[in-house]
Amino acid sequence: SMMTTFSMSVLLPLYFEGAYGMTALVAGLLILPAIACNAVTSIVGGRVMDARGAWPLLPVGFALIAVGQIAISMTAASMNIGVVVALTVVVYAGVGLVLSPSQTAGLETLPAAEHPHGTALLNTWNMIAASFGPSLFIGLLSSSAATAGAAGAATDVAQAIGFATAVRVAAVIAVVGFATSLAYARRESHMSH
């Protein structure tokens, strides 16, 4: 989910600016509803995690991320900005349900004496994901946009195609996260009952 947050926060402005010719300010403002939704769902996710545990919170969150990204990848090339903004809210809602609760669920599996080491590992992997994700997805966007441009697509259309390709790959990663969370959260739920 850390990879999703940082990647989408970089890809979306590139998409809005490259495909629609928007200013950085307008592109940033279009992400604001998703960020606000993320803040709310982070609070909700924390409360649900405290009350019920990881099941069904993590699978639902990853499902929202995956479904939102799949839908964005299918609509981005058609350049329907309202749909992309709405689907971005769905993705960020899923991230809010996953980010902190997944870290809590991971730390809960460790003995108390190991929590500092677990926290250090989580922080390290979060930073790796936050660094790797945008690099990977910007590379995919750029490569795909260049290929589309070389095939004769207009610059704005090529940028939209590149964005759709990058989000499609991110969706595959989210589907893997969903499958993993389904197995993990269900196992944790059965072990606690």
Locate the predicted segments by residue.
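12-transmembrane solute porter fold
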Residues: S1-A148, Q159-E188
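Interfacial non-cytosolic loop connecting adjacent transmembrane helices
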Residues: A151-D156
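Short, charged juxtamembrane terminal tails flanking transmembrane helices
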Residues: S189-H193
